[in-house]
Amino acid sequence: TEGPYFYVPMVNTTGIVRSPYEYPQYYLVNPAAFAILGAYMFFLIIVGFPVNFMTLYVTLEHKKLRTPLNYILLNLAVADLFMVIGGFTTTMYTSMHGYFVLGRLGCNLEGFFATLGGMISLWSLAVLAIERWVVVCKPISNFRFGENHAIMGVSLTWGMALACTVPPLVGWSRYIPEGMQCSCGIDYYTRAEGFNNETFVLYMFCCHFTVPLTIIFFCYGRLLCAVKEAAAAQQESETTQRAEREVTRMVVIMVIGFLVCWLPYASVAWFVFTHQGSEFGPLFMTIPAFFAKSSAIYNPMIYICMNKQFRHCMITTLFCGKNPFEGEEEGASSTKTEASSASSVSPA
């Protein structure tokens, strides 16, 4: 059922469909589902905010962590905090009420922050892939990834993310409640007159999904070939090769995590867009959308688990300058992030 600034996934043959901005949507699913949704968002908030804030705080406190590669990783933490503060808190509040009680303004803000976080994450992973390709494969001789390049990379991620998330705020497409009507996203559902949803969705999928994914797959495809060649030729020391492999492994796992979280949502969104008017239940979009939101906690978790130096610095921060697990954290100086300035293979 389509209405002004909303689309409820139910045929209004019984006349029970109401605006998700004004009435509880308990006719869509059992009211308990809204409580579960709210509890899930609360979990993401109490986990996502501390780990992302700690990632920022520890990096700013410890000078040795302020490497060019870490600028991009910090950018991911900032994006996740935007999702937690601007998106998750709003969705938890609306879930508790059973409808989007904050109105259109709240919907625009929630949709904007949630989409912004996802876009910054994807473009950050594309920049990381380019960094790994340039550092490891050396397509440009004597090139060193430095602070200026990292700042340019961060600026690119924000520029591209804003190019995707601002248009719906100013009339090219729009943000509307989706699924159980407690969170908002791009309007994939309607051909609302005056909003040009079709052209925006095509622009979004081509320029802000296909392009960064193509960059990621190209860079890592070249990188894998180069790593195999280097291993066969033994052109660099084992320590250098191992450090580069560890950094690359961490970034690849982040990419896989992003795809696991966001690919189901993107696939469902594309299906809805190409099958407008087809019947589907509220959970069809709700489950992928809320699964995608879990991406706000996996990036810092991967970073903490796979980076010895950062883990060591975080523990010393938490324990007031001491590391009670010093023996387990030995070798922290051989870091994954410091390895970003090294190269382990010959030019690709």
UniProtKB/Swiss-Prot annotation:
Molecular function (GO) terms listed? 11-cis retinal binding; G protein-coupled photoreceptor activity
Under InterPro entries, the record lists:
GPCR_opsins, GPCR_Rhodpsn, GPCR_Rhodpsn_7TM, Opsin, Retinal_BS, Rhodopsin, Rhodopsin_N
For this protein, the parts annotated as crossing the membrane are 34-58, 71-93, 108-130, 150-170, 200-221, 250-271, 284-305
Residue ranges, Cytoplasmic compartment? 59-70, 131-149, 222-249, 306-348
Report the protein's function: Photoreceptor required for image-forming vision at low light intensity. While most salt water fish species use retinal as chromophore, most freshwater fish use 3-dehydroretinal, or a mixture of retinal and 3-dehydroretinal. Light-induced isomerization of 11-cis to all-trans retinal triggers a conformational change that activates signaling via G-proteins. Subsequent receptor phosphorylation mediates displacement of the bound G-protein alpha subunit by arrestin and terminates signaling.
What does the similarity note say?
A: Belongs to the G-protein coupled receptor 1 family. Opsin subfamily.
Q: What is this protein called?
A: Rhodopsin
What is the organism of origin for this protein? Answer: Sargocentron xantherythrum
